[in-house]
Every structure is written in C-alpha cells, then in structure tokens.
C-alpha cells in the first residue's frame, strides 16, 4: 500500500487547499466548491499516471500518431454530500468512466458519540475495475471503510484509490490498517489530530456545510 502526500510536492494544489482553509475565503461557497473541484482535477491527473497504458494509433489530417492512453476501466465513487464537487473534479478528467454514490451520515447517540450509517448505494459492477473513492475530509477513516465495504457488494476491484483533500494522521493510519494491499491513498494535506467531535484540526470546518449550507 502506498500513501502519496501531494501537498508535500509544493505545487499550485496547495493554493487551492489554502483558500479552502482560510476562514474568510471559504465563505464564498462557489469558490469553495470550485477549489474542491480543482483538487479533484489535479488528483485525477496524478492517479491516471498509475494506470495501465495502451498505445493507440490515430489518424491526423497529416498522417498517423501513436498515443499512450490509460486502458483500465474506471469507476468513480464518492460519499454524499461533501464529496459531490470533489467527484465532479475527477469526472472532468475521467469523463468516460462509470460512477457510484454512497450516502453515509453520522447518527449521534449524544453530543459527542455517534455511529456511521450507510443508507444508500448506487453503483455499477466494479469487478476487475479501478475504483476511485473520493471524500474531501478523512477524519477517522470509518466512513471511508464502510463505503468501501458497501461497494464490495458490487464486485471486487482490480485496484482501489482513496482520494482525500485533508486527512488526519489517525485516519491515514487507520485506512492503512483496514484496506487491502492493492490500495493507494492520495492526500493533499495531512493534519495532526482530530477534536472531541471528530473534526480534523486545524482542518477547514464542515466541508458539506461550506459547500452547500448548514444542515438541520
């Protein structure tokens, strides 16, 4: 299993993450969603480098050219609702791919304690395909684990890519312990801890609320 920390490469990606974190800039919902989408586009490009390539010959107006292109069948999956703009970023690049959606939410027992519930899944067959699961925030890793297990009811993928914008170190360690060896984890930023409410610190707040408004 490989963990790829894209933020450590000091690229323009870090500006998108910085704007999402900034308490003033993040209040612009359109810009916040677009920055999530941009990170998805960057990660889609990086993930494509890991895929099996096929050389195809195409005819141009002046002759023929050989082009190396990814040949894997890809399924893009995300966890609703915060994952939607992230998913759109991936879909902008993997526009030919199939899509899957999982609904996961926190069911609180009291102010601090909760369980993660999976309520809805819509997915094609993922057998022998490359599965990319995107969720902008990876706080504990529990939602990602349950989403993956739910998707396994639709087949066994060839390879799994876990994509997140900000993850806690705890979540990265947890995912490494519960996911199979044919998994690659992609992170834009790794933060040191989570608070008593299981929010990433320093993080950026509630990504779903920032993108779409507060929920009741």
Curated annotation (Swiss-Prot):
Cofactor(s) demanded: Mg(2+)
Cofactor: binding details: Binds 1 Mg(2+) ion per subunit. The magnesium is bound as Mg-PRPP.
Pathway: Pyrimidine metabolism; UMP biosynthesis via salvage pathway; UMP from uracil: step 1/1
Annotated positions binding 5-phospho-alpha-D-ribose 1-diphosphate: 81, 106, 135-143, 206
Catalytic activity as recorded in UniProt: UMP + diphosphate = 5-phospho-alpha-D-ribose 1-diphosphate + uracil
Key words, A-Z: Allosteric enzyme, Glycosyltransferase, GTP-binding, Magnesium, Nucleotide-binding, Transferase
Keyword Magnesium: yes
Family statement drawn from the similarity comment of this UniProt entry: Belongs to the UPRTase family.
Primary role: Catalyzes the conversion of uracil and 5-phospho-alpha-D-ribose 1-diphosphate (PRPP) to UMP and diphosphate.
Name of this protein: Uracil phosphoribosyltransferase
Record organism: Porphyromonas gingivalis (strain ATCC BAA-308 / W83)
Organism ancestry: Bacteria, Pseudomonadati, Bacteroidota, Bacteroidia, Bacteroidales
């Amino acid at each position: 299993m490989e963990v790829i920390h894209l933020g450590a490469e000091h690229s323009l990606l870090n500006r998108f993450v910085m704007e999402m974190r900034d308490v003033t800039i993040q209040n612009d919902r359109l810009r916040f969603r677009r920055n999530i989408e941009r990170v998805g586009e960057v990660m889609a490009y990086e993930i494509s480098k890991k895929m099996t390539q096929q050389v195809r010959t195409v005819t141009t107006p002046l002759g023929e050219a050989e082009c190396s292109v990814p040949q894997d069948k890809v399924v893009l999956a995300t966890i609703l609702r915060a994952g939607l703009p992230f998913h759109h970023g991936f879909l902008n690049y993997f526009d030919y791919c199939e899509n899957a959606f999982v609904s996961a939410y926190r069911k609180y027992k009291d102010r601090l304690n909760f369980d993660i519930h999976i309520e809805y899944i819509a997915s094609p067959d993922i057998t022998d395909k490359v599965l990319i699961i995107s969720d902008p925030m990876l706080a504990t890793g529990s939602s990602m684990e349950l989403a993956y297990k739910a998707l396994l009811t639709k087949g066994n993928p060839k390879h799994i890519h876990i994509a997140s914008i900000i993850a806690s170190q705890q979540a990265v360690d947890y995912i490494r312990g519960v996911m199979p060896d044919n998994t690659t984890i992609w992170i834009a930023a790794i933060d040191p801890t989570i608070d008593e409410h299981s929010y990433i610190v320093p993080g950026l707040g509630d990504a779903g609320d920032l993108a779409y408004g507060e929920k009741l």
